[in-house]
């Protein structure tokens, strides 16, 4: 009798980041305004700010070898390997309220965050 090997059962692995519809839609709008469909949103962490690290956002046409990518609503999010360790599990969102409009990162790895929300410590 021949035994048939079954494929291993795999569970859905959660994405390393949450890139909200609101953020993706705003990035899509900004890319359309720039007139360059090759642009991708790069989110990164660098030293600075009042808490030690700060978030940065920029458009980039290039995907580097060590980048983690996520596509949402036709928009590509890029995170480099150094920033990845600080951002894994984070939510990248876009909020509009009476105080203005801005991209917001909710980061479970941050032990403290400054009042403006643009810098953090781990």
Curated annotation (Swiss-Prot):
Gene3D superfamilies the record matches: HesB-like domain
Needed co-factor(s): iron-sulfur cluster
Protein name: Putative iron-sulfur cluster insertion protein ErpA
Pfam name, any one: Fe-S_biosyn
Residues at which iron-sulfur cluster binds: 50, 114, 116
Gene Ontology biological process terms in this record: iron-sulfur cluster assembly
Keywords: Iron, Iron-sulfur, Metal-binding
Record's subunit section: Homodimer.
Keyword Iron: yes
Organism the protein comes from: Cupriavidus necator (strain ATCC 17699 / DSM 428 / KCTC 22496 / NCIMB 10442 / H16 / Stanier 337) (Ralstonia eutropha)
UniProt cross-references to HAMAP family, sorted A to Z: Fe_S_insert_ErpA
Presence of the UniProt keyword Iron-sulfur in the record: yes
Example GO molecular function: iron ion binding
Entries under NCBIfam families matching the protein: iron-sulfur cluster assembly accessory protein, PRK13623.1
Cofactor-binding details, from the entry: Binds 1 iron-sulfur cluster per subunit.
């Amino acid at each position: 009798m021949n035994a048939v090997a079954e494929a291993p059962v795999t569970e859905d692995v959660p994405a390393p980041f949450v890139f909200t519809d609101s953020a993706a839609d705003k990035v899509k709008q900004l890319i359309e305004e720039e007139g360059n469909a090759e642009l991708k949103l790069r989110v990164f962490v660098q030293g600075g700010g009042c808490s030690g690290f700060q978030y940065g956002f920029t458009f980039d046409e290039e995907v580097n070898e060590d980048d983690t990518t996520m596509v949402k609503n036709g928009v590509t999010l890029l995170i480099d390997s150094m920033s990845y360790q600080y951002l894994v599990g984070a939510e990248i969102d876009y909020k509009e309220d009476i105080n203005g409009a801005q991209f917001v990162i909710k980061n479970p790895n941050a032990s403290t965050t400054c009042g403006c929300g643009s810098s953090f410590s781990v």
